[in-house]
Design a protein with these regions (language model features):
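Cyclophilin-like peptidyl-prolyl cis-trans isomerases
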Residues: 1-207
Length: 207
């Protein structure tokens, strides 16, 4: 995959006092191939995300630790988080949703705080005002957990209902957003808008 070293956009975000995490995305794969080897899938690219840690510290830390694997199972000490999970819902011209490493279908919830959900933190500072906004998926007020979505275009009707806690680095047209567009283009099936092929987060962490 791509070099995970800092670039100017990453350094600018860090200089603003924010943190930056990444996802390496692969389409398909993860299964045994016909010749007995492992099908690695098709790399779609890397998504770099700036986290608004000063405006949404609790939401960002929950997300960050699920990216880095710092949060672990209390019994096995195995990392708990987004690595090897999938985008489970994709709606073209709207958003791409992921983060359910609990059940994999959009029903799972957990947090680093010892509860399944936590309260809405800041619904006013940042808006769903364009593509590339990182927002907390929920099932109603104060039901934030591990799931999140990235907008594909402006979605102002979500303002005041979902916490926007970060954004895709580089803006629309940048490399990270191009990876989001590749996810957006994957065919889906059914009313749940489930991708027809697994869209996997094969690596993630903090830059």
């Amino acid at each position: 995959m791509q070099n995970s070293g800092p670039d100017p956009a990453v350094m600018e975000a860090i200089n603003r006092g924010n943190k930056v995490v990444f996802f390496d995305i692969v389409l398909g794969g993860g299964t045994e191939s016909a010749d007995g080897g492992k099908d690695e899938g098709k790399p779609l690219g890397r998504i770099k995300l700036e986290l608004f840690v000063n405006d949404c510290p609790k939401t960002c830390e929950n997300f960050r630790q699920f990216c880095t694997g710092e949060h672990t199972d209390p019994v096995t000490r195995a990392p708990i988080g987004y690595k090897n999970s999938c985008f489970h819902r994709v709606i073209k011209d709207f958003m791409c949703q992921a983060g359910d490493f609990v059940n994999g279908d959009g029903t799972g919830k957990t947090t680093i705080y010892g509860t399944s959900t936590f309260a809405d933190e800041n619904l006013t500072t940042h808006k769903h005002d364009g593509p590339g906004m990182l927002s907390s998926a929920n099932s109603g007020p104060n039901s934030n957990g591990c799931q999140f979505f990235i907008t594909c275009k402006k979605a102002e009707w979500l303002d005041g209902k979902h916490v926007v806690f970060g954004k895709v680095l580089g803006g629309d047209g940048g490399e990270s957003m191009m990876t989001v567009r590749k996810i957006e283009a994957v065919p889906t099936k059914g009313n749940a808008n489930q991708p027809r092929y697994p869209i996997r987060i094969v690596q993630c962490g903090e830059l």
